[in-house]
Structure formats: C-alpha cells, structure tokens
From Swiss-Prot:
Gene3D superfamilies: 1.10.246.80, Beta Polymerase, domain 2, cca-adding enzyme, domain 2. It comes from Staphylococcus saprophyticus subsp. saprophyticus (strain ATCC 15305 / DSM 20229 / NCIMB 8711 / NCTC 7292 / S-41). A single active site specifically recognizes both ATP and CTP and is responsible for their addition. GO terms for molecular function: ATP binding; CCA tRNA nucleotidyltransferase activity; magnesium ion binding; tRNA binding. CTP binds at G28, R31, R112, D155, R158, R161, R164. This is CCA-adding enzyme. It is an enzyme of class 2 (transferase). Pfam families: PolyA_pol, PolyA_pol_RNAbd, tRNA_NucTran2_2.
Length: 399
C-alpha cells in the first residue's frame, strides 16, 4: 500500500541511493503508516554524512548539523535528512555528550526510544524491524528498544514521551518499561520545562488521556515539574482529551489557594493570556444566575470560549470546580443570547472616551474607564440604545 507523502519524498531517497548511499524512511511516519494513522512529517535517515548530503542536494539548510540533521528543500517542501548515528554517554539525563556518525542502519535504530519508533522502511515499502516493533504495535504495547533502565537514564523525557504515546494510541506499557519509568521518574527534574510541556500538550489532547494521566499520578511525576509541583495532582481527575491550556486553567481553578506562577511553564504569551481568561471565565460562571447576568457574561467572554468550557462540564463537576446553574447557563441559552447581543465589543459602541470627556467637561482619569464600562453594560442590558444621541443623553445623567 503506497502513501502520497512517501511517494512525494521518494526522489530524496532515490537521489541518495544514486550516489551510493543507503536511505530509509524512519520513525513516527513509518509507525503511523503501519497503524493506518494520518502521517504528518516524513523523517529520512541515511548513511551519508551532513557534508555528503549537502553535496548531493542543491538546496539545503543545516538546521542541526552537529546532530547530523540537514533540511533538504525539494519542490518547495523541506525534508529532514539525518545521518545514521550512534551516541556517547549521557551525563545529565537529557542529551548525549557525543554523537558519532555511522554507516549502518542497525546502529542507528538501536539508539531510539521505543520499538514502534525504531522501524525503517525503504523506497519499495520493505520494512526493516530489528526490535519487533511491528509485533508490539499489533499487541498494542509500548516497549523500549533494549534495556529500559538505560533508555530512561539516557534521556528522562522518554518517560513522558511514552506516556504521551499511551494517551494518543491507548497502548499498554510493557511491564519492564513501566517499572523503569517509575524508577527513573525523578530524573525529569533535570529536563528543560519547555521539552516537557511539548509532550504534555500532546498528552492532554490524547483520546486515551485518562489511562496516561493516571500513570503520571501513579509515578508522582508532577512533583518534579515546575509550576505543577505546587499543586496536589491527586485531587485532579482527567478523563477526557482537552487542550493543555484548558487543563492548566482547570487545575488553577480547582486549587485557587495555590499561588503558582504560570511563567514557570515557559509557554507563549498568548497561551498565558488564554489560561488567565479561562480561569476568570470559570470564576465568574457560577455567579450567573439571571438572564441579564448571562448577557453581560456572554458579552465579556464570547460564545466560543463559554461553549468550550461547557463542553467539559463533566470534568468541571467531577473535579468540584464549578456548580453552574444549568437552567441559566447551557449551550442553548448561551447561543441564543450571543445572537441577541446589540454589539460584540467596545469598538462597536457609538460613543467613545473623547465624547464622554466633552460631555463631562472633566479631565481624564479612572472615572472615564468606569463610565465607558457602565455605558457598555447599559447597551448590553438594553437600558439604552447604541445610538450616539441616546448615549449622550444617558451619559449626561451620570457624569
């Protein structure tokens, strides 16, 4: 069975082979192909060194030359081509002290994390599976390549990656792999938080997140991770896939007495803003008890975010985060109110701060922001029409 992404990348392998180098597809793309899952990225491994790769191809980018990786540009697409390599000792549970380029496929794949990721495939779709990765896929088993204690001692991130794969695929952890994860979990404290968060983002969004999250709790993994170590994760249950930012917001909302710094997660400013918005939304959702309060709530937070939070209502209740009044706040009422709102943002108001300053004949100050907010709410609640002459009259009676 062919695959369009592999077919598109075939000329890369053909050109390397034409120059007498070995070349194979490897890793996640081969695994996903064998599992009939969508393939997103193609990784190519070769006996050619970085210098030789650059000699073979006209357009290249040396994105990871020291690790043997060169980006090859072909027909507008970029392909990661990595030299067969072996690794020296690991001193910090994160990265090898040395990388050695080798000429043998077996030497390359034996350094990989899990058997299902150590499968290579040639240009004719012939499989090279030295560690029974296909059997483990068939039996839905996550097993390390070789000794699991050695694999996790080399790079503790493999523990989180293994649990991420469990969340995505629903596979079981092979017994020795499970035991080694438990034995080495404390080593994740040596990892950069950014690397951990990359895996956690995929983990919380997995279809089988419950199984994986329970293992994280069993391993007491969170006590070794910045930000999360301040929370009592045993109190939190995660049964359904959700974005990482939503998970963090729910955890903060559940344990508001904890004063942890979101900045410790090293996520983007947009993600931090998203978390804070969701926390504020959850804080206020219980206060919505009337139709007029619902109007203001929908105006402030928007239909999209409110409906997202409501889609996790079971998780919110299971974790005792909220006691929403379902008769007032539900998908139908939120959608209806959103349709009826006279405006969606302050930019649509038919009056602005300059107008109000002229009416009041006062200097600007905190009062102006408060007045603009009052005008907003008056429009949303239907107290006044969003029409400048009417708004001016309304403001005159209040400043």
């Amino acid at each position: 069975m062919t695959n369009s992404l592999f077919e598109t990348a075939k000329p890369i392998l053909e050109k390397l082979q034409a120059h007498h180098f070995q070349a194979y597809f490897v890793g996640g793309s081969v695994r996903d192909y064998l599992m009939n899952r969508p393939i997103h990225d193609i990784d190519i491994t070769t006996s050619a060194t970085p210098d030789e790769i650059e000699t073979v191809f006209d357009k290249t980018i040396p994105i990871g030359r020291e690790h043997g990786t060169i980006n090859v540009i072909y027909k507008g697409e970029q392909y990661e081509v990595t030299t067969f390599r072996s690794e020296g000792d690991y001193d910090d549970h994160r990265r090898p002290n040395e990388v050695f380029f080798v000429r043998n496929l077996y030497d390359d794949v034996q350094r990989r994390d899990f058997t299902m990721n150590a499968i290579a495939m040639d240009i004719n779709y012939q499989i090279f599976d030295y560690f029974e990765g296909q059997q483990d896929i068939k039996h839905q088993l996550i097993r390390t390549v070789g000794n699991p204690d050695e694999r996790f001692d080399e790079d503790a991130l493999r523990i989180i990656r293994g649990l991420r794969f469990q969340s995505q695929f629903g596979f079981h952890l092979e017994e020795a792999t499970f035991t080694a994860m438990l034995n080495h979990i404390a080593d994740i404290k040596y990892l950069a938080i950014e690397r951990i968060v990359v895996e956690l983002k995929k983990l919380t969004n997995g279809d089988f997140v419950s199984k994986s999250f329970n293992n994280l709790k069993h391993f007491m993994a969170f006590k070794y991770i910045p930000f999360f170590k301040h929370y009592d994760i045993t109190k939190f249950t995660l049964r359904n896939a959700m974005p990482f930012t939503t998970f963090v917001a729910f955890l903060i909302s559940q344990q508001r007495e904890i004063d942890a710094n979101i900045a410790d997660l090293k996520v983007s400013n947009n993600e931090k803003k998203r978390i804070k918005t969701l926390v504020q939304l959850i804080d206020q959702i219980d206060e919505v008890q009337t139709k007029s309060q619902l109007k203001l709530f929908v105006y402030d937070y928007g239909k999209k975010d409110i409906l997202e939070v409501l889609s996790y209502l079971d998780e919110l209740k299971r974790n005792r985060i909220t006691s929403i009044s379902p008769l007032i706040v539900n998908d139908q009422t939120v959608t209806e109110v959103a349709k009826q709102l006279p405006m969606l943002s302050r930019s649509e108001m038919d009056i602005n701060g300059k107008d109000i300053l002229e009416i009041a004949n006062k200097k600007s100050g905190p009062w102006l922001k408060e007045t603009l907010r009052e005008v907003e709410y008056a429009i949303i609640s239907g107290e006044v029409v969003n029409f400048k002459p009417e708004l001016k009259k309304w403001v005159k009676t209040r400043v």
